[in-house]
Amino acid sequence: SEVGVLPEIPEEKIVKKWRLQPGKMLLVDLEKNKIISDEDLKDDLKRKHPYGGWLKSNQILLSDVPKEIGPMTPDEKSLLNLQKAFGYTQEDLKFFLEPMIKSGEDPIGSMGRDIPLAALSNKSRLLYDYFFQNFAQVTNPPIDPIREELVMSLVSFIGPRPNLLDLTSGGKQKRLEVDQPILTNTDLERIRRIENHLTGSFKTLTLSICYKKDKNTVDIDSIISSLCSKAEKAVSENDYNILILSDRSVDEDHIALPALLATGAVHHHLIKKGLRTDVGIVIETGEARRVHDICLLAGYGAEAINPYLSFYTLSNIISKSKINVLEDEASKKYIKALNKGMLKVMSKMGISTFQSYCGAQIFDAVGLSSNVVEKFFTGTATRIEGVNLKEIQSETEERHLNAFKNNFEYDNVLNIGGDLSFRLNGENHVWTPETIGMLQHAVRSADYSIFKKYSNKINNQTENFKSLRGLFKFKNINKPIHI
């Protein structure tokens, strides 16, 4: 792609000059001693099989499936309970969802993170917070998703996947195509009841990822194992080819498993049983609302995601605020913002299509025990130990209890959050009004003693808030090592 890499080649020996463009290829045929261009190469390949006919007979667009009536929107009290159960905060509404429906863009904040890691926080954290996105560490972006939009695609296929190496089985498996992986509540109902319109092509089964609240300790490991067994049986014995993992049945008596945990568990269980390519996985969850959440669900195997509670929350925001946006338009802008955010995340690793990103697991786990990672997020890098399954269960049940108990002081408001900026009763921060004021005082007065107080305060905070650096200590040994 670079001119001048091969210098001193006489012009009379050059037959043609061009650059290798994105999405294009060339073949050097050593037997025939010639270079085959992109156009000739693809012309030869496309004539070998009736690909167009296969697509026409087996590729089904979700937009062509008739609409179905979805569940009713919950009342305001029920909506608030659901938001609390799934860990929504006032910051989520004000700094994420509201800007999304105003601009259709993924909100951008300042750099820098001065809050504890999820595993070291004394606040209840969602499982998504224990994962960090990987990125290609190069000086220029691997892909520019804006200027190289031509090679970017969020198209997803739901259902069984054909063997890419077996060209004799073409046209035998139906594929359900969606132009992007975020499903509205109406779209999800289309998939749930797809047998009403496409007899014999797809069979959809909804598996609840909720479990009944019990006074005694619930064994969450056995609940996940039961969920995986149901998924395996549905595919291997009953020929279901679309599974919907749903937490819609959450209520005062039923607690939802973290959607990411359920997704990773079922995805890897089906892989181990050799059944994953026989079925598509769709997630119906009230927990996911941000780009990071959606990327994690997709990265651990979800071909499509329906963040139903986000859509209900958008409707509530519009009804209460002065935002002049219709409900349908707000949903479209929210989906647009999520899509742009996903393209940005994919491009950081040089991935251009959602189909390549789905199940790729391009994350590091930080603060999860190796047992949890090995069992439910197999193959994910984890550098330190951390919380186990019981602690994840405890935090989930704590949020559920706070959502449905009668607490008159905070009954009608969401938790303030405090991740993005310092708030009383919010998440701990290293940079607080006290430390910032102390630094300003030290600089303006040029008083070293005040600066020492400031530095001691910062150092104490890194230990108290348990940052990894703050926990680092040298170990004294009795026998020095000779160097």
Regions found by a protein language model. Give the residues of each.
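Flexible, glycine-rich loop/tail regions that form catalytic "lids" or insertion modules at the edges
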Residues: 1, 5-7, 15, 34-221, ...
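Loop/turn positions that initiate beta-strands
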Residues: 21-23, 28
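Conserved, mostly hydrophobic/aromatic
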Residues: 26, 247, 266, 297, ...
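Short, ordered loop/turn segments at secondary-structure junctions
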Residues: 31, 248-250, 286, 302, ...
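Conserved short loop/turn motifs at secondary-structure junctions
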Residues: 116, 246-255, 280-287
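Active-site-adjacent beta->alpha loops and helix N-cap segments on the catalytic face
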Residues: 252-265, 313-323
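Alpha-helix-loop-beta-strand connector modules within alpha/beta enzyme cores
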Residues: 255-283, 333-340, 344
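Catalytic cores of alpha/beta
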Residues: 287-301
